[in-house]
Amino acid sequence: MSTIAAFYGGKSILITGATGFLGKVLMEKLFRTSPDLKVIYILVRPKAGQTLQQRVFQILDSKLFEKVKEVCPNVHEKIRAIYADLNQNDFAISKEDMQELLSCTNIIFHCAATVRFDDTLRHAVQLNVTATRQLLLMASQMPKLEAFIHISTAYSNCNLKHIDEVIYPCPVEPKKIIDSLEWLDDAIIDEITPKLIRDWPNIYTYTKALGEMVVQQESRNLNIAIIRPSIVGATWQEPFPGWVDNINGPNGIIIATGKGFLRAIKATPMAVADVIPVDTVVNLMLAVGWYTAVHRPKSTLVYHITSGNMNPCNWHKMGVQVLATFEKIPFERPFRRPNANFTSNSFTSQYWNAVSHRAPAIIYDCYLRLTGRKPRMTKLMNRLLRTVSMLEYFINRSWEWSTYNTEMLMSELSPEDQRVFNFDVRQLNWLEYIENYVLGVKKYLLKEDMAGIPKAKQRLKRLRNIHYLFNTALFLIAWRLLIARSQMARNVWFFIVSFCYKFLSYFRASSTLKV
């Protein structure tokens, strides 16, 4: 039996961010491999009129948990939903619930965070820094706690080219920022934000770096580890390939490309697309939880889980495979034929944005106005391009992450644990993974039926023919206008026609002689 799976048996586990993508996959893996665990505490808020228990049932109703229900039929009884608001002091947890958490928790997986690149500094600091600090304070009062696993990001120090598995200091102490945000008004905060984040590309990466500093400073005598995943993507193997449930990161790009809205991106084609499957991240998290609790390292260890240094795939290769998959399994009702042009040149990027994005959106909105409908495409396109622009920093660069601790941990696992909790990204077949990724977006995000593929292919063929006809008509009109205005253009045109006529005459004469 797996040593790691046995370790989590009988444990009480606290997961923050359990309703998010990573948190759901973590819960699924825990229940599937360690169905005899005692309880999983999840911190949630009522949402859209739902009670806490209704939110739990909604999570378990997902296809993701189908296998879990077979091995752990009473799974809903092992999830203890606790009302909490990470924006409030002490998370607004009731005294009774707090007492239960403090007295029973064995393992903490801190996954909660705001991942918005354009979030306000106040909100991002509250969730990514202050909440982490408060959770560490809670952890220090848990007598049965064995390990605290903090999930950060590989891009927390993206202002560096080479990133080691260490915690880097930030220019300003987290405590000073937390204290200053309590009395500064929003206008002043917005004004000083660019000066604070300095070389970091956005507030998200900056506050995740601050969060790591807080972990280091507030660790006390706790057994703590930090995990830094890169771009978290769809499942690779477990519980099945291609599962995804949000439109963040690559998922939104795949949808926008497959629907024909996004046809050109400012990106360096040969830059590494450092995508890491979510189940690989979860397997490392569980292995790190076991290792931290059992071996009790003297210092806080940092683990990188990235693909670029072990099994790199560049954006060009990924784009080619995504388009090839769209040919086989296209999305339904695309706006235009899917395409993906990568360019690192700013002028070329602006040209493609004007020709491939804004112009079609304006034309379509004119059509909507003429037919008495409300124009919406230009607004949607502007929002899409604004979102893509926030990703440009990451798709135009490559980083080097050291993975000494991750490789060390892999070597510490038994063959059975390496199989059950596989986080060896060197085994990943990118072509197969990308195809399953696109298929998963179609099935689980867009909720499109596979039976509709033949009809979608017909529509794609129709759009391709329209594209060719439009380009041909545009060329002929432009050429006709050019001929009418330029003697040189007329001479070139007559030369081409004359040459073609002579070539055809020669070919016909040659055929006659052979006969």
From Swiss-Prot:
EC numbers, comma separated: 1.2.1.84
Protein name as it appears in the record: Fatty acyl-CoA reductase 2
Gene3D superfamilies xrefs: NAD(P)-binding Rossmann-like Domain
Predominant location category: membrane
Family listed: Belongs to the fatty acyl-CoA reductase family.
SUPFAM superfamilies on file: NAD(P)-binding Rossmann-fold domains (SSF51735)
Keywords: Lipid biosynthesis, Lipid metabolism, Membrane, NADP, Oxidoreductase, Peroxisome, Transmembrane, Transmembrane helix
Cytoplasmic side, ranges: 1-464
InterPro entries reported for this sequence: FAR, FAR_C, Far_NAD-bd, NAD(P)-bd_dom_sf
Subcellular location: Peroxisome membrane
Bilayer topology term: Single-pass membrane protein
Domain of life: Eukaryota
GO biological process assignments: long-chain fatty-acyl-CoA metabolic process; wax biosynthetic process
A cellular component term, taken from the record's GO annotations: peroxisomal membrane
Reactions catalysed according to its record: a long-chain fatty acyl-CoA + 2 NADPH + 2 H(+) = a long-chain primary fatty alcohol + 2 NADP(+) + CoA; a very long-chain fatty acyl-CoA + 2 NADPH + 2 H(+) = a very long-chain primary fatty alcohol + 2 NADP(+) + CoA; an ultra-long-chain fatty acyl-CoA + 2 NADPH + 2 H(+) = an ultra long-chain primary fatty alcohol + 2 NADP(+) + CoA; hexadecanoyl-CoA + 2 NADPH + 2 H(+) = hexadecan-1-ol + 2 NADP(+) + CoA
Peroxisomal side: 485-515
Residue ranges crossing the lipid bilayer per the database entry: 465-484
Purpose of the protein: Catalyzes the reduction of saturated but not unsaturated C16 or C18 fatty acyl-CoA to fatty alcohols (FAls). A lower activity can be observed with shorter fatty acyl-CoA substrates. Can produce very long-chain and ultra long-chain FAls, regardless of whether they have a straight or branched chain. Involved in the production of ether lipids/plasmalogens and wax monoesters whose synthesis requires FAls as substrates.
Pfam families in the cross-refs: NAD_binding_4, Sterile
Organism taxonomic ancestry: Eukaryota, Metazoa, Chordata, Craniata, Vertebrata
Entry GO MF terms: alcohol-forming long-chain fatty acyl-CoA reductase activity; alcohol-forming very long-chain fatty acyl-CoA reductase activity; oxidoreductase activity
